[in-house]
């Protein structure tokens, strides 16, 4: 019984009878529970423009076509502006969409949208939390100059099987949490698909889109294993596919793919390490077959491989050091234009492939100097190197780059460092508390972005 001490008695039964046993009360010690207020924490923190978003908050966000969307939460934050109605793309304080770094379990998501931007590319049921930094960006993040959106997937229940499913106007989804080894290993499986073609059928004939089609699906899995209290390993997988056509002769499609692994190691009470490695992929294609003799396929893709290590060293009760590095190898197929079908006279054209290496080292220091004054300072040093094989032109000195001013063509061999760009990035934020409920913050960031998206706005 509750609050009753276990008692054992040895009994020899010879006949029917009654035995009264006196039980003693006991006390159960509960683990300490700390309850904090988010508003008070915001006053105490040195971070500016940082928000932590959780799926439980989604109920307060308007739904698009019956689907909850974590990116809609992002768009509702100060300084964030949507790029269009019912769209999941966003701009942060005047920045462009390609100046936002979107991470899912350490992997880069290049296109976070489904179905013309009506839905986010990831199922909210598999999201544990999302952190967005619009200013005072920690030194561990880099590569974009506007904002960082870091999304973490949740681990499945390690004790019992759970699942959920949903059917909406245009989408259906399934989420399963499967324990493999109790309290040690679990697998999360999440999937979502659409049956949105019926929307296109409702459009008037004169729109030209009545015979169009559109659809998507995404799949995610998280395998979590706990070796012991000091070591754990998570393996992540994610894939999304979109296809749409405005008519039977013009088709579009794109895909996201991420695979990564993360190992957490507690070296001692003051030093924790996180080690990650993974692969990210994004591709896009467009097929035009309205005229068989001019039918073509246009495609490009981005592939990147990354390794990273992050360390947290607790120097004192209110003094923490963060340091680490990240390195990414890019393979970019800038574009392929080729005939579609045997009757096409289109001449195949393949742009040169780009290869680059981006590496950064960082050091951050969080220090509560006094109960009133806290400082978060950091430095990140990044390097971006364009690699061979590649051919490039040399132009006449003092002349603008043009075909008529080309003086030579230089070919760089495989793996050769053609050009390296590098420099420091400084991060600083401070907080001074006048009272327990009122503080003033200030911050400064310098950021570097080496890869950009060129958009056709004509």
Give the positions of each predicted feature.
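Signature of Gram-negative outer-membrane beta-barrel scaffolds
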Residues: 322-435, 450-451, 455
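Periplasmic N-terminal accessory/gating domains of Gram-negative outer-membrane beta-barrel systems
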Residues: 3-5, 9-13, 17, 40-137, ...
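Periplasm-facing N-terminal accessory domains of Gram-negative outer-membrane beta-barrel systems
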Residues: 1-32, 372
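Transmembrane beta-barrel wall of Gram-negative outer-membrane proteins
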Residues: 170-193, 207-243, 251-279, 315-316, ...
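Extracellular loop and loop/strand-boundary signature of outer-membrane beta-barrel proteins
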Residues: 160-162, 205-209, 244-250, 258-262, ...
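Transmembrane beta-strands of outer-membrane beta-barrel pores
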Residues: 134-136, 153-155, 169-171, 180-182, ...
């Amino acid at each position: 019984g509750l609050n009753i001490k276990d008692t054992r008695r040895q009994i020899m039964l010879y006949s029917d009878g009654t035995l009264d046993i006196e039980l003693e009360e006991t006390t159960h010690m509960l683990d300490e529970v700390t309850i904090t207020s988010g508003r008070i924490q915001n006053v105490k923190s040195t971070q500016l423009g940082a928000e932590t978003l959780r799926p439980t908050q989604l109920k307060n966000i308007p739904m698009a076509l019956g689907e909850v969307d974590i990116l809609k939460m992002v768009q509702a934050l100060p300084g964030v502006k949507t790029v269009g109605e019912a769209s999941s793309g966003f701009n942060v304080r005047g920045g462009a969409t390609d100046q936002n770094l979107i991470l899912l379990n350490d992997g880069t998501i290049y296109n976070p949208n489904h179905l013309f931007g009506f839905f986010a590319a990831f199922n909210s049921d598999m999201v544990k939390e999302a952190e967005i930094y619009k200013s005072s960006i920690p030194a561990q993040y880099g590569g974009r100059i506007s904002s960082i959106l870091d999304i973490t997937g949740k681990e499945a229940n390690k004790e019992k099987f759970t699942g959920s499913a949903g059917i909406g106007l245009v989408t259906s989804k399934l989420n399963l949490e499967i324990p493999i080894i109790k309290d040690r290993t679990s697998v999360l499986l999440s999937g979502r698909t659409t049956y949105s073609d019926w929307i296109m059928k409702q459009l008037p004939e004169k729109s030209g889109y009545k015979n169009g089609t559109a659809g998507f699906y995404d799949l995610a899995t998280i395998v979590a294993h706990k070796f012991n209290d000091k070591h754990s390993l998570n393996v992540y997988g994610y894939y999304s596919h979109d296809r749409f056509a405005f008519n039977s002769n013009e088709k579009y499609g794109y895909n996201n793919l991420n695979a990564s692994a993360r190992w957490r190691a507690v070296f001692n009470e003051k030093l924790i390490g996180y080690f990650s490695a993974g692969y990210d992929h994004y591709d896009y294609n467009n097929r035009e077959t309205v005229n068989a003799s001019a039918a073509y396929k246009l495609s490009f893709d981005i592939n990147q491989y990354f390794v990273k290590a992050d360390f947290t060293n607790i120097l004192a009760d209110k003094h923490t050091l963060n340091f680490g590095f990240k390195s990414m190898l890019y393979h970019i197929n800038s574009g392929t234009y080729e005939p579609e079908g045997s009757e096409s006279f289109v001449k195949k054209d393949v742009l040169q492939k780009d290869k680059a290496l981006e590496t950064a080292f960082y050091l951050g220091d969080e220090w509560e100097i006094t109960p009133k004054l806290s400082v978060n300072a950091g430095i990140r040093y990044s390097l971006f190197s364009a690699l061979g094989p590649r051919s490039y032109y040399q132009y006449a000195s003092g002349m603008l780059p043009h075909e008529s001013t080309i003086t030579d063509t230089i070919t760089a061999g495989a793996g050769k460092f053609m050009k390296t760009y590098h420099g420091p990035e400084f991060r600083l934020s401070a907080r001074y508390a006048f009272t327990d409920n009122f503080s003033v913050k200030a911050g400064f960031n310098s950021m570097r972005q080496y890869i950009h998206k060129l958009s056709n706005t004509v």
